[in-house]
From Swiss-Prot:
GO terms for cellular component: cytosol. Catalyzes the ADP transfer from ATP to D-glycero-beta-D-manno-heptose 1-phosphate, yielding ADP-D-glycero-beta-D-manno-heptose. The active site is at 259. In the N-terminal section; belongs to the carbohydrate kinase PfkB family. In the C-terminal section; belongs to the cytidylyltransferase family. This is Bifunctional protein HldE. It is an enzyme of class 2 (transferase). Residues 334-461 are annotated as: Cytidylyltransferase. Its EC number is 2.7.1.167, 2.7.7.70. CDD domains: RfaE_like.
Amino acid sequence: MLEFLSQQKPKILIIGDFMVDNYTWCDCSRISPEAPVLVAKTLKEDKRLGGAANVYANLKSLGADVFALGVVGDDKSGKFLQENLKGEFLIQKGRKTPFKNRIMAHNQQVLRLDEEDISEILLENELIALFDEKIKDFKAVVLSDYAKGILTPKVCKAVIKKAKALNIPVLVDPKGSDFSKYSGATLLTPNKKEALEALKFENLEGENLEKGIKKLKEDFSLRYSIITLSEAGIALFNEGLKIAPAKALEVYDVTGAGDSVIAVLAFCLANEIEIFKACELANEAAAVVVSKIGSVSVSFDEIRSFKSMSFEKKIKNKEELLTLLKQNDKKIVFTNGCFDIVHFGHIKYLEKAKRLGDVLIVGLNSDASVKRLKGESRPVNSEFQRACMLAAFYFVDFVVIFDEDTPLELISFLKPDILVKGADYKDKLVVGSNLISRVELIDFEEGFSTSKIIEKIKDKK
């Protein structure tokens, strides 16, 4: 599929809130004598395409022939967008084009300064007329809504009605709690928070996810209903609920991930790719984007490289792992074991452990450690083979091998937020529990154990 898509150049039109993302990179190494605040020394500035313009950049990077339609102010940011995007922009005098200045220090965002006008545009009729004039030449339309006043109910309804009459798919990245202005679109891509606000649900856990995503499809007459679930992937409701699991290995910055998702979906639908396959590809694109800093675009070459990346990269030593963990403010879950012959019970256990936090680390006993604990005939599989099997599961973020009989030293070194063990430790002391504030015991699936599997194999011989 990637080979086919990388050779296509579909014409895609984008309407929405085109913005400028500015990054001011600073060095913050001292406190001001005037007040208890950081002193930031500017090192460099980096101006990028943001909002709908970032969707444009993603589509262009994928190889699409992209055209932008929008309204900007008569200011520097509006001029920057006109100079860097192919399209047509109506100029509304006195309007501030959205400009977001992110102050960055040591790869962390410490402050954001916004300049914008979020009132509804005065040029609705002119924008609709411009769309009507251009639309017939395109294979897909994207509405990128950041609630900055461009995509008014009148504009959205007119665009969707016209595109639908021409059988052109309309994909919407929505904003706000009222999705009625998007009724009749091909699909929406709300994240979990946006979906909850629109549905007035308390949560989207368990059965609520299927109820909610189906309700969105029915209430707003969508062809497909989608909810992006961050680290859990993308939920799709067509004839039933399906979830495309997330693919990210390391997350540095989620800025622009949603833009990449809708760009890939639009590119795929413009080329008549089956929707679930499109969602899987969108997940892979998002994984590439969140591994970078800032609003960035993604290409098919990067996705291809990501897909070919070996899961062996998830196997780290403790020093490498600590460095990675320090770069992210994530809830760390730790569990450990021999995992000699991985079975269904292990899979369910690790899947449940992952749900407790953001990053799941599995401490794996080395071959020497297993031999001391289990006897000379073990392990059946080498430590590298066992580590690779664990790393192949999407819900395992990292595997670290330790040589000691217990993971105490490793737990002390990594300092995870949550320590997880099986429910059989209910009346036992969990190693490392004195170092960690939260310990969770998870029930095992009955009837599954490595020892039983080994005995069963021996009996058959």
